[in-house]
């Protein structure tokens, strides 16, 4: 999710960039979840303050998901704080910490691998996403994705979520639709390729059971002297739990339905964007999602998690 309690960090240039250990981030995130009060760490005070600033314990539809904005060097594997301009050789990434649990979400250990499998599956479905990877340490696997509001180490692009552009109340769950999202794209004069891209994401979310498809999980990017464009997809992961207030059904409706969505419902949306390939896209994504266990095995998702998720996926 992008926005409040999302990915933004202090952009001041006088903040000292320092190397950080991922296990320190995990440790502090765990303590933050168990107690919002002060806690002891093995870091210096200024480093502890900076780590707290880059850690975002955001409450999303699935629960508390600890994230941190970091500067990462792909060649050396070195991690630094991501509050400032990225040093030479570093780029800004968002890391979602694995091995941190809270009572609302339950244990997260293993979900970094699930999100990586979903990333690979989404890419195979033709969905546009930023480069992503797993950072492994101490038997944990943290999902990392490059930030789409940054380019190189310095350039920052303007981003607005669907929610922000339309001045929606994010807390009004089950009040908005994919049709409204497509209409917003028309208002921004986005082209057919963008419409088809969103159609792919919608179909994927239905078949792969990503019910965390709320108004802050779709965004638009405006580059300097450019035009509005659909931002790359993010927060693409399995999010379905029967009985949940948040993810027992889709946040955005499709043809006035949030569950029990049929192929016909998807085709109606396809007709509305004048797509001649909607039936083919649905079949293509259905076949790819049907290979879930291949994607899960590739990144070593545990057998139990892979089976539990596989039982919920749809084929239409």
List each language-model region with its residue ranges.
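Phosphate/dinucleotide-binding and metal-coordinating scaffold of catalytic cores
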Residues: 1-215, 219-316
């Amino acid at each position: 999710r992008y926005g409040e309690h999302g990915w933004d960090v202090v952009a001041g240039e006088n903040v000292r960039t320092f190397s950080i250990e991922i296990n320190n981030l995990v440790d502090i995130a765990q303590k933050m979840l168990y107690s919002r009060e002060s806690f002891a760490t093995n870091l210096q005070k200024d480093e502890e303050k900076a780590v707290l600033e880059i850690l975002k314990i955001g409450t999303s539809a699935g629960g508390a998901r600890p994230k941190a904005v970091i500067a990462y060097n792909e060649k050396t594997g070195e991690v630094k704080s991501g509050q400032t301009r990225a040093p030479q050789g570093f780029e800004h990434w968002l890391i979602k910490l694995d091995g941190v649990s809270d009572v609302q979400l339950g244990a997260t250990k293993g979900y970094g691998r699930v999100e990586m499998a979903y990333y690979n599956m989404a890419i195979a479905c033709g969905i546009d996403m930023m480069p992503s990877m797993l950072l492994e340490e101490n038997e944990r696997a943290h999902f990392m994705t490059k930030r789409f509001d940054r380019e190189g180490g310095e350039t920052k692009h303007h981003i607005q979520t669907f929610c922000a552009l339309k001045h929606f109340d994010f807390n009004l769950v089950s009040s908005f639709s994919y049709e409204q999202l497509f209409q917003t794209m028309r208002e921004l004069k986005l082209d057919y390729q963008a419409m088809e891209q969103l159609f792919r994401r919608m179909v994927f979310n239905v078949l792969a059971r990503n019910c965390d498809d709320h108004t802050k999980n779709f965004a638009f990017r405006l580059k300097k002297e450019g035009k509005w464009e659909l931002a790359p997809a993010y927060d693409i992961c399995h999010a379905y739990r029967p009985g949940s207030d948040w993810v027992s059904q889709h946040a955005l409706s499709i043809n006035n339905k949030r569950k029990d969505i049929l192929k016909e419902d998807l085709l109606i949306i396809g007709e509305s964007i004048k797509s001649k390939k909607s039936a083919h896209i649905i079949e293509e994504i259905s076949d790819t999602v049907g290979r879930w266990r291949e994607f899960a095995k590739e990144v070593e998702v545990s057998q139990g998690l892979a089976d539990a998720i596989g039982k919920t996926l749809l084929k239409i």
